[in-house]
Amino acid sequence: MSLGIDCLPQRILCALALLVANGTAAATELPDCSRPLSLALHEHGLLYSRQTGGGIDKDFADELIRRSGCRINVTVMPRARIWQLIESGGLDFSLSGIANEQRQLFAAFAWYFSNKYYLLVRRDAGVQKVEDFVRNPQLRLGAIRSFRYSPSANRLVDALDADLRVSHSTGLAPLYATLLANQIQGMIVEPFDYPALESATIREQTAILEFDDPAVPHGLIMSKRALPLQEQAKWRALVDSMRADGTVDRIFDKYFKPELSRAMTRF
């Protein structure tokens, strides 16, 4: 699905807009736009919604396009497919990604927010703490295919997966449905999922447990195979400029209360 987003003004106008936004002619050197670039979003709560066509990542992508002056084809696809294409070099960018040892072999990152992860459990599962979920072999966890989380959440998913106690899905909506149907008894959630968690049906039937982990940095994902080191540095500088001038704060303020927004964007 192509969203048909590109920088409509001429490149020089985009460059001038970037200089004005940063208030100085010594702004970051612009990335190479000699070829069309590609960026994939994934549907996930407040990050992006097919239904509304908007979200945090969509806003972030729009601003990257505006500042860089590059033609970037934006599509929507499952997260697992995104990582495959980033690794092969078939995709230049994605957003809101987290790093691990394996991913760092083929992807570079430019951080712009961080958040914590939580375990959402059915109230009738008898789970008071995360360890209770592990100890009960009758309980199953739902997870989005290829997603990684905080260290403790990753250990939980990996341990249960080894015991064949994880049901994988391509997105959040199927997980909520299987949770309400009691086909799974828990799933990993984060702040972008809050609107769904506030629905009466889910709120009445679930409880939230916190993992004892610090917030995990998320950022622009850059394919090392597609983008040379010099270009990665230019895109990272663009992201840093968005953080420095308050643009990232303003994007998150559209979706979260100020206290939570600042906790996520100032790390």
Model-derived regions: residue spans:
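Bacterial N-terminal signal peptides
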Residues: 11-22
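Extracytoplasmic small-molecule ligand-binding "clamshell" domains
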Residues: 28-105, 168, 245, 255
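Short loop->beta-strand "edge-of-pocket" segments that line small-molecule binding or catalytic clefts
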Residues: 33-50, 131-149
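Periplasmic-binding protein-like
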Residues: 41-44, 115-116, 200-239, 256-267
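Extended ligand-binding regions for polar small-molecule ligands
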Residues: 58-67, 131-140, 147, 220-259
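Ligand-binding cleft/hinge of the Venus flytrap
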Residues: 59-70, 110-112, 135-137, 146-169, ...
